[in-house]
Amino acid sequence: MNTQPQFQLKKETLFSETETTNSKQLAILKANFPQCFDKNGAFIQEKLLEIVKSSDVELSKESYSLNWLGKSYARLLANLPPKTLLSEDKDHNQREENKNSQNLLIKGDNLEVLKHMVNAYSEKVKMIYIDPPYNTGKDGFAYNDDRKFTPEQLSDLAGIDLDEAKRILEFTTNGSSSHSAWLTFIYPRLYIARELLREDGVIFISIDENELNQLKTICDEIFGEANFIENIVWNKRIPKNDKGIGNIHEYILAYAKNNEISKEFLMRKDGIDDVYQFIEKLKKEKVPLDKAEQQLKKFYSSNGYDRGITLYNCLNEDYRPWGKINMSWPNADSFGPTYEVLHPLTNNPVKIPDRGWRWKEGTFNHIAKRIDGKYADIKKLHDGSVICGGIWFASTENTQPSSVKFLDEVEEFLLRSIISTKSDGGVEVENLFGGKGYFSYPKPTSLIKTLFGSVKTEDKDIYLDFFAGSGTTAHGILELNIEDGRKRNFICVQLDEETDKKKQAYKEGYKSIFNIT
């Protein structure tokens, strides 16, 4: 991913102690509800309640929240200004291949980078995907913080007692991997990430069972419970060397900035582009349709496609794949209309489904182009069957007719709450680096493309990943742009974290993860 403009953080003494735990929230209240503050800046609760009540907003008497040692500190971190400067990597950016890129790769602590981004990218990011540390106990997560507070400073800024401040500073400086440490780490990053999202923006967060429940609760707090979209299950692999129960899935929490705007999420059927490429090959080779259909069925079988694709195993004269859709009444607890349908070749009535037809007779006649009892358009197929308008008939009346549906008419459907991907992220990274696996369990580009491709996009929409890792997000966006002709832009952030000296990546000169990104 090193063909993108690069920026890096430089540490400076820019720390300000004027911010407190709720500085941003208070500023928003003052800007939007100035009438709720007196001349001394004191908040007048009753006036805000008057506004709420006059707007017919129901007041809830029930609420809950997740509290942990360090939450007050996490909220303070979200409000503090950056303590660094962002500088350009001029040598890299002036290279000819990087000059005109609209994408950004930033090296540094993502919390600091996010704080800088608020100035230029507030409410400008279309979509965020992050794959943060899962805190499994084996992924190397340990909270480390170089912000040099004294207990007295932290107590004053966060509004907590001195003893709590001391306990917080103890785990922030000692590399803790507790639930509290992880929550303190992730909370301010998500809080600022929300500020970057557009009103129609969406965030996807990968996680596993170790922190799922905690993450869901703080996301409800940050993004609003009403803006929760789905907890997507990602079927990732066949279990390998698992004990007890084979773990084959992870989770992806999805939240909208405003769920009233972000309504529909679509996904392309997995593997459909490979199907189109195979059919195009058959067409170029001018394989006869009957043999082409046989080869297509074998292709489906050998690649394990699901019924959403394998149903479309017929080809028309232009090699456009289509399938036969059952015309029986779909509801088991009721019956559909029954009427006589004549076969277009034999003129004998076809068998009526046990529960009746799916459509009324008028609808059937319209789709079949049947006018005054006669079919206006009859196309004979290579196997003796025929198509009349949008209805398929077998060569005799002994088989029930089916409606005709083309694969390209149904290649997209609503994003499912369970996503399965055929590709392996580890193999993809190995292929990029000559068969060498420098990353453990990277996400496959197909997953990123499914998520990012699910939302309607415009040219120059910005996509953000502030746990860039192997660069899968950037890779996926570049592939999406090639496939659909869009011009999405990405911003990827990665800490200049040293690679494990025992790993192959370090031995071959990749001293930091950023070098690989």
Where are these regions (language model features)?
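Conserved Class I SAM-dependent methyltransferase catalytic core
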Residues: 168-231, 491, 514-516
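Conserved S-adenosyl-L-methionine
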Residues: 68, 110, 141-154, 183, ...
